[in-house]
């Protein structure tokens, strides 16, 4: 589980645990 900041700018990508908000 990475920090949401990582997926914050990548909301376009599928949230496979990459900081799913």
Curated annotation (Swiss-Prot):
<keyword id="KW-0356">Hemostasis</keyword>
<feature type="compositionally biased region" description="Acidic residues">
    <location>
        <begin position="1"/>
        <end position="10"/>
    </location>
</feature>
<keyword id="KW-0399">Innate immunity</keyword>
<feature type="glycosylation site" description="O-linked (GalNAc...) threonine">
    <location>
        <position position="4"/>
    </location>
</feature>
<dbReference type="GO" id="GO:0007596">
    <property type="term" value="P:blood coagulation"/>
</dbReference>
<keyword id="KW-0765">Sulfation</keyword>
<comment type="subunit">
    <text>Heterohexamer; disulfide linked. Contains 2 sets of 3 non-identical chains (alpha, beta and gamma). The 2 heterotrimers are in head to head conformation with the N-termini in a small central domain.</text>
</comment>
<dbReference type="GO" id="GO:0002250">
    <property type="term" value="P:adaptive immune response"/>
</dbReference>
<dbReference type="GO" id="GO:0045087">
    <property type="term" value="P:innate immune response"/>
</dbReference>
<feature type="modified residue" description="Pyrrolidone carboxylic acid">
    <location>
        <position position="1"/>
    </location>
</feature>
<keyword id="KW-1064">Adaptive immunity</keyword>
<keyword id="KW-0175">Coiled coil</keyword>
<dbReference type="GO" id="GO:0005576">
    <property type="term" value="C:extracellular region"/>
</dbReference>
<keyword id="KW-0873">Pyrrolidone carboxylic acid</keyword>
<keyword id="KW-0964">Secreted</keyword>
<feature type="modified residue" description="Sulfotyrosine">
    <location>
        <position position="6"/>
    </location>
</feature>
<keyword id="KW-0391">Immunity</keyword>
<keyword id="KW-0325">Glycoprotein</keyword>
<feature type="region of interest" description="Disordered">
    <location>
        <begin position="1"/>
        <end position="21"/>
    </location>
</feature>
<keyword id="KW-0094">Blood coagulation</keyword>
<comment type="function">
    <text>Cleaved by the protease thrombin to yield monomers which, together with fibrinogen alpha (FGA) and fibrinogen gamma (FGG), polymerize to form an insoluble fibrin matrix. Fibrin has a major function in hemostasis as one of the primary components of blood clots. In addition, functions during the early stages of wound repair to stabilize the lesion and guide cell migration during re-epithelialization. Was originally thought to be essential for platelet aggregation, based on in vitro studies using anticoagulated blood.</text>
</comment>
<keyword id="KW-1015">Disulfide bond</keyword>
<protein>
    <recommendedName>
        <fullName>Fibrinogen beta chain</fullName>
    </recommendedName>
</protein>
């Amino acid at each position: 589980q990475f920090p949401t900041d990582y997926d914050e700018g990548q909301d376009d990508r599928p949230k496979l645990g990459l900081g799913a908000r």
